[in-house]
Design a protein with these regions (language model features):
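Positively charged n-region of N-terminal signal peptides that target proteins for export
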Residues: 1-4
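C-terminal motif of bacterial Sec signal peptides marking the signal peptidase cleavage site
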Residues: 14-15
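Hydrophobic/aromatic-rich core segments of domains that either
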Residues: 25-34, 47-48, 176-184, 189-196, ...
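Secondary-structure boundary elements
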Residues: 41-42, 49-220, 254-256
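A short, amphipathic beta-strand motif
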Residues: 316-325
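Short amphipathic beta-strand segments in non-cytosolic proteins
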Residues: 330-349
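Short Pro-Gly-centered beta-turn/loop motif in secreted/extracellular proteins
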Residues: 354-364
């Protein structure tokens, strides 16, 4: 579930971005890096003889000023950092009791924002770029454009989780599953991995008062929707599947909801990690009453300044250049009432009030 803290941070980021940054050039991004500039220049120097990887590195660096890690942890009375390993507890209530006892002993919770442009080093970025290109060569990823690769496979983060260095491990863990499944495209590869998620992940509150890390979700195998989506996005990108996180704020319930979407042939297909694949989750979003979103927003890595965001005096996360309203990208299902239930027979596209289904024949 999303929290007000996340919305507050996004609002702060948005306000700064709108007021000070009208699109960032490579040189502007480097100038924002401060002492970390030398690390970013090492990346550019490393790829100077590889034009396509150099452009990928430039893409990451240009957009790094908009991204950060949300770091949260306990600080002991002696000033030492501590984060409980939830695998060492029987359940989330035991984790909560442990955290409560820490605060009774004088531990405090510290929250800080660490900006990527000032913190990520050259070896981390080079490793992620090389592994992303390696994944892009897989058969199910071969038809993905360079633009699609940069936006949905290359990025080293999904949202505001602490930057993870798990791409290699996740690739080695999940790649054999797709290879053995002989996936022909990203959609099929996503189906295979999401079925494995059913064994690896479970929707469950951790009891931890902190924003989840990719590592914690993978090791413990539990998390709420934001944790599962962040992990699923990074796991799928690690094996060359173009995936993003999408969100909505509930209008009749507390908090919000996240799910993922995979890119196939220019269209995004929704799926819920460890719950429903891209062949069925959009139908659930449209037909299950409590899942129907009022608005759908896609989390971007590259800041979008094309759409006008007039300054009306209000600071809101909805103005973030990292959010794209994709409510209009609605797929619809043509269903037949078959044996006492509606069953989908075709997927179409909705444009305003018109729904289009192709190649539907027969009358039985």
């Amino acid at each position: 579930m999303k929290t007000c803290f996340l919305f507050m941070i996004l609002s702060i980021l948005t306000s700064c971005a709108i007021q000070k940054i009208k699109g960032v050039s490579l040189e502007q991004a480097l100038s924002m890096a401060g002492e970390n500039r030398a690390e970013l220049e090492k990346v550019l120097e490393y790829y100077k003889n590889d034009s396509i990887k150099l452009e990928a590195a430039r893409y990451l660096i240009r957009n790094m000023p908009f991204h950060f890690s949300r770091m949260e942890y306990f600080v002991s009375p002696e000033g030492e950092r501590y984060v409980p390993d939830i695998r060492n507890f029987t359940d989330n209530q035991a984790v909560k009791r442990h955290c409560d006892s820490l605060q009774e002993k004088g531990y405090t919770i510290r929250k800080e924002i660490v900006y990527d442009i000032k913190a990520l080093h050259s070896d981390y970025l080079i490793r992620n770029i090389d592994l992303a290109f390696q994944a892009w060569q897989k058969p199910w990823a071969k038809d993905i454009s360079f633009e699609g690769f940069c936006r949905y496979i290359l990025p080293y983060r999904a949202e505001v989780e602490p930057a993870s260095d798990m791409r290699q491990e996740l690739m080695e863990y999940y790649l054999p599953l797709i290879d053995s499944g002989k996936a022909r495209n990203a959609f099929e590869a996503c189906m295979i991995i999401n079925k494995q998620f059913i064994n690896d992940l479970k929707y469950k509150e951790t009891g931890q008062p902190f924003y989840p890390t990719v590592e914690e979700t993978f090791r413990a195998g539990i998390g709420e929707c934001d944790a599962l989506c962040n992990f699923a996005t990074m796991a799928m990108r690690a094996v060359g599947i173009p995936v993003v996180v999408q969100t909505t704020t509930w209008t009749k319930m507390d908090l919000a909801h996240s799910w993922c979407a995979v890119l196939q042939d220019g269209e995004f297909y929704d799926f819920s990690p460890a719950y429903a694949g891209p062949d069925e989750y959009r139908q659930k979003l449209m037909t299950v009453r409590y899942l129907k979103p009022a608005k759908v927003y896609r989390n971007l890595f590259d800041a979008d300044f094309k759409k006008s965001r007039t300054d009306d005096g209000y600071t809101t996360y909805l103005k973030s250049p990292l959010l794209k309203d994709v409510t209009a990208e609605s797929l619809v299902y043509l269903c037949a009432y078959n044996y006492y239930e509606w069953k989908p027979v075709a997927i179409g596209i909705q444009t305003d009030a018109v729904c289009e289904f192709k190649d539907v024949v027969g009358n039985n």
